[in-house]
Amino acid sequence: MRAVFIQGAEEHPAAFCYQVNGSCPRTVHTLGIQLVIYLACAAGMLIIVLGNLFVAFAVSYFKALHTPTNFLLLSLALADMFLGLLVLPLSTIRSVESCWFFGDFLCRLHTYLDPLFCLTSIFHLCFISIDRHCAICDPLLYPSKFTVRVALRYILAGWGVPAAYTSLFLYTDVVETRLSQWLEEMPCVGSCQLLLNKFWGWLNFPLFFVPCLIMISLYVKIFVVATRQAQQITTLSKNLAGAAKHDRKAAKTLGIAVGIYLLCWLPFTIDTMVDSLLHFITPPLVFDIFIWFAYFNSACNPIIYVFSYQWFRKALKLTLSQKVFSPQTRTVDLYQE
């Protein structure tokens, strides 16, 4: 995999990004279409940044939210927020203008940060599924099994593995020496796109489907446990009935998360594998649509995992009412009905 950029090329005023042989053709949109696309992308980035920023703030500020599960949510929110802040602005301009105007250094940096934040988000979704599975299917041992230290290990793995993987395919000599074998297969030069040969294209497959299979299998088990509890709810005490209701809600939330995860990432992952075999035949517009579908998952995460919980609504209300500036607010029990 390699980010390709021709530095020092002059921009062609009509049909090409740069005045060199093999330069990317520039798609010229009308001003109205450009405005619509920019506004849509800006709205998406705003949701991603503000939604995840508030998740990070709420978990950090309110002491009642300092739990292993919420620390995973905090780390997930940071990954998605950084994606919206550092990656998507440049991706928006590249998608609308169909050209890269920011030089070789930013091309490399953007190419590194994009998969880093996306993979980190995917890994955290998988770890949150594991956490919810332990909490629902093994509630008695959960407090001792999933501690803050365990959560921090998951967070370290969730950032460390994607960082190592992304560094491997961008900055190792192995990739550089094999680049000449398939560099000519790239669609054009000067586009700052990730180019995947067959090996890297198919390596992306388990990075998507392994977390997906883990989440699906855990969801099925959680759903079975929650359904069994619902059938026995008439014989349960009030407290246990409340716990069963909470478990069913967790199962529903996880099911929605898995479904949206598949919807957002499946088109891009399949296209990446197929494209590496068929000499990069995917039109740039179609590729942009697929990758923005994947980006959209980062906007859904705070809605799926947090907006449906009462503690988040209470935290949001306290913040908007400016009561958050009171010293006593930090110790408020957000879980109290």
UniProtKB/Swiss-Prot annotation:
Keywords: Cell membrane, Disulfide bond, G-protein coupled receptor, Glycoprotein, Membrane, Receptor, Transducer, Transmembrane, Transmembrane helix
TM segment ranges: 35-55, 71-91, 110-130, 155-175, 205-225, 254-274, 285-307
InterPro entries: GPCR_Rhodpsn, GPCR_Rhodpsn_7TM, TAAR, TAAR_fam
All ranges on the Extracellular side of the membrane: 1-34, 92-109, 176-204, 275-284
Molecular function terms, GO-annotated: trace-amine receptor activity; trimethylamine receptor activity
Stretch list, region Extracellular Loop 2 (ECL2): 176-189
Compartmental location: Cell membrane
One Pfam entry name: 7tm_1
Protein name: Trace amine-associated receptor 5
Organism, as annotated: Pan troglodytes
Gene name of the encoded protein: TAAR5
